[in-house]
Amino acid sequence: AVVRPVSLAVHQPDWSRHAELVKGRPEVFQMRADGTRQPEVLCYGHPKTLETYLEGIRNAVAGNGKKYAPVSGKSITVSPADVELACYCEHCKKLWDKDGGQYGGASRVVAAFVDKLAREVKRRWPKEKFTVIYLPYLNYTAAPDGIKFPGNVEVQLCGMPGLAAYKEPAIRESEQKNLER
């Protein structure tokens, strides 16, 4: 049996370097307000993105290379590009929280994706015992109501106010409430 450790890969996967995805599956990339796609950022609301993630995991498990796969050891990373998410596609618009503020507008979009991914991974590859590592950051940091991740998800939250600000009681309380959700 192959032993794979749990390890982290940030801002993964980067599908912008796969021309066949950029041209053949543009819907997996974030849609700008003008309708063009931004290949450096994934669209986490479109079903094709989940399908492509799972295709990559299937390739990695089968030993067919790591094409499209955000797999590192026993870990599958969901860590969007280092920008705020702002996808204007119909799928993301349905999940967007207009009242989410600076830390929660895109939270439901990415959290729903992570939830679906983790459940599919657990169902399809139970023997692999993969951990889906989710790194909430920027405008998808606030935990959305109504999503309870399965046990194969590890959340590594980035506290957006910055560590030094935690000395302020209001910030500390707000961040603690988010952690407890």
Predicted regions mapped to residue ranges:
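Catalytic-core regions of glycoside hydrolase
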Residues: 1-51, 55-181
